[in-house]
Amino acid sequence: MLQRDVFVDQLKGYACLLVLLGHVLLGLISCGLSLPAFLPFSERFIMSFHIDLFMFLAGYVYHLTGDAASKGSRLRFIGNKLLNLGLPYFFFSAVYIAINSLTPGVNTASSLSDILQLWRQPVAQYWFLFSLFWLFVFWALLSRFFNNITITAVLFTVFTVLKYLNIDLGFLDSSMHCVLAFGLGTCLRSLAVQKLPAAARIAAILLPILIVSALFLT
């Protein structure tokens, strides 16, 4: 039996807290209140990586649990993800749209007809389930021909080129935005930080700080 990785569970918990904090800050900022200067920066900082952290962990667990072969066949794996991700996605999205369409004064109005577009146009926070499902489909299909490193490189290259050419990715846009984070997770064999060289641990701490500082403090 595969032993549960407690560190991954802890990281998921931290990521959930970051999502909650980020959206609380976003709500405060959007209200137009007079706020300390560091709050908008804090919100942008959190939003810059919290979803990527979730996708990275999803990719890591995908690889840790045996990739697409874990269910016996790729088709069975995709069917399993359709049940585990697709059903909650359609159910809760439909409930969200129904309530939103019947409630006056909401920030983002919905129509009941939007339910018919859920197969290609996710709503609200449920885009995460939609994107994650398609990432699993990408990896399940491509893993027949390539390893995880190659899949990550190919998909990220395709995404970068299409974005550079300003080509619309349609309903796959949100998934393609997450291929690098998810793919890096699939390429990692272990999250045991103590096994990494000291230089790698230092770089893992300093590099994100330097990148974020360059993006938001200049």
Regions found by a protein language model. Name each.
Residues 44-53, 65-100, 107-124, 131, ...:
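Transmembrane alpha-helical segments and their boundary/interface "anchor" motifs
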Residues 51-64, 130-141, 165-197:
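Specific transmembrane alpha-helix
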Residues 22, 92-104, 212-217:
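C-terminal TM-helix exit segments that contain a strictly Trp-centered aromatic cap at the helix terminus
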Residues 39-51, 116-130, 164-183, 215-218:
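Interfacial loop-to-helix transition and helix-capping segments at the boundaries
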Residues 150-163, 205-212:
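Small-polar-interrupted transmembrane alpha-helices in polytopic inner-membrane proteins
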Residues 2-5, 67-79, 140-150, 189-201:
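Membrane-interface helix-boundary motifs at transmembrane edges
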Residues 197-218:
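Alpha-helical transmembrane segments and terminal signal-anchor/GPI-anchor hydrophobic tails
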Residues 6-66, 85-93:
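Functionally critical transmembrane alpha-helices in membrane proteins and complexes, commonly lining
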